[in-house]
């Protein structure tokens, strides 16, 4: 199969993932900004990763937050924490990222991270020139319903790139499902945190490195 477009997830694919404790501390800081210094640990956990609109509504009701303001502040605080991780050298690109410079197809990014974080990382690591489009989430509660496996942002990227035969590369099962929902092929990349991962989905390709894309895209 020859692909004319490749789209990537960002965290865990192009750059290293942010440690969970960093995200949790940033979420705790968000509560503190609203005057809550001892929130229920379960509420912090719910707001750290994978929050749903209903969970945001529940937490906001418990602490008398305005939901959109709380979530906007949470996203901003978590983004700033990730930016600091990058500046400190604790969140860095994977070593095989350079191989994409020779991949002669239009490329894009679709991440469930904040748009602010995606934009910062592209600029900070000076890799924005590799990609023709890049989508993250807006800092809104509605964006939580548009995360992968919803193909919303992926379909926007494919439209930007005028893709006819596209491949989406990810490190999560939600990435593979998003590709399926968008009607395109997928590649699951076996980064160290996924080396022994047992999949419950069926990607088109199972790869160890971004280098593998050269053979795949010309197969």
At which residue positions do the language-model features occur?
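Asp-based, Mg2+/Mn2+-dependent phosphohydrolase catalytic module
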Residues: 1-3, 105, 115, 121-219
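N-terminal helical cap/lid subdomain that shapes the substrate entry/recognition surface
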Residues: 2-102
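Extended substrate/RNA-proximal surfaces in nucleic-acid metabolism proteins
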Residues: 108
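Conserved phosphate-coupling serine/threonine residues in phosphotransfer and NTP-handling enzymes
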Residues: 111-113
């Amino acid at each position: 199969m020859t692909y004319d477009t490749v789209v990537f997830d960002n965290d865990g694919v192009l750059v290293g993932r942010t440690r969970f404790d960093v995200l949790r501390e940033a979420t705790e800081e968000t509560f503190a900004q609203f005057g809550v210094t001892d929130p229920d640990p379960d509420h912090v956990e719910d707001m750290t990763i994978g929050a749903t609109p209903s969970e945001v509504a529940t937490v906001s009701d418990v602490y008398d937050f305005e939901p959109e303001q709380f979530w906007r502040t949470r996203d901003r605080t978590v983004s700033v924490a990730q930016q600091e991780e990058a500046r400190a050298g604790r969140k860095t690109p994977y070593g095989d990222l350079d191989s994409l410079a020779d991949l002669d197809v239009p490329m894009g990014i679709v991440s469930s991270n904040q748009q602010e974080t995606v934009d910062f990382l592209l600029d900070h690591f000076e890799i924005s020139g590799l990609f023709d489009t890049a989508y993250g989430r807006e800092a809104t509660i509605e964006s939580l319903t548009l995360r992968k496996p919803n193909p919303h942002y992926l379909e926007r990227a494919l439209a930007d790139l005028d893709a006819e035969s596209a491949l989406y590369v990810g490190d999560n099962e939600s990435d593979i499902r998003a590709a399926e929902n968008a009607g395109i092929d997928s590649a699951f990349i076996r980064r160290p945190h996924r080396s022994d991962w047992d999949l419950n989905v069926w990607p088109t390709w199972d790869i160890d490195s971004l280098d593998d894309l050269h053979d795949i895209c010309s197969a």
